[in-house]
Amino acid sequence: METALLLAGKITELTLIVLMGMALVKSKLLNSEHSRTLSVIALYLISPSVMIHAFQIENTPDIIDGLKLSVALAVVFHILLIALGRLFKTLFKLDTLEHAATVYTNSGNLIIPLVMSIFGPQWVIYTSGFIIVQMFLFWTHLRLLLCGRGNLAWKTVLTNINILSIFIGVFMFAFQIKLPHIIDNTLATIGGMIGPVAMLVAGMLIASLPLKEIVLSKRIYLVAFLRLILIPLILLVFVKISGIAHLGGHSDTVVLISFLATVSPAASTVTQMAMVYGQNARKASAIYGITTLLCVITMPLMIALYQAMV
């Protein structure tokens, strides 16, 4: 319960930053297009800094075991998410964007600052498993959903700055290559901005949406229910039955971090790729915005249930 309360407090802080981002646009100091500048900073500077800094730790058997578990969990969880997405697409006649939003979560932008605040920066390394698997699927499975078959670009996958930063971090971790203290501290300082910047971007995007249209859209609430409540409950049952949280070592915390990544709102990447590939970007933004606002209630509840059951 303590973790759930800490989570609720941190998500509330991030939600207030979302409202600040909305206020900047509503007051006409900025417009929603300016969010692209912050998105570029987050994608190409802040996120890589977080991942490289996360791997600047001692190479120990416990950490290796935790990393292996985080990658394995990421693969298993994504298999389940994709399977559930297909099932719900059929049952609820979801369109492409609704389908994508049920499968892909905002794990990087939201989970990293939450893990840093609740568990400490030394635990951020265990978010890398979920992020690297998800990033690979963004440019393969998600791209296929939005564009159709025959549109994979492996060069794009392998040269993605976030994938490269994880590879660099893993390489330095494996060979225990330590950055100079001043550089590592600089990366840590930049990385600390990931939550506020991501939430400002979210607020700026939400401010440009037609709120009346969103509030009256039953489909958006259906997607929010699937993404934030039903799918997390199904995954929670899987964690409970499998007993993976009780493997020993750091498994309990690693599994909790991985589960946290699956209960977060719809991925901002779905919105960004919808813009690029000619899908309904306004609808994608609406789903992203509503699930981001509602997660302040649903995420602490899911973590409280997790701690009570597991």
Annotate the PLM regions:
Residues 1-310:
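Alpha-helical transmembrane segments of multi-pass small-molecule/ion transporters
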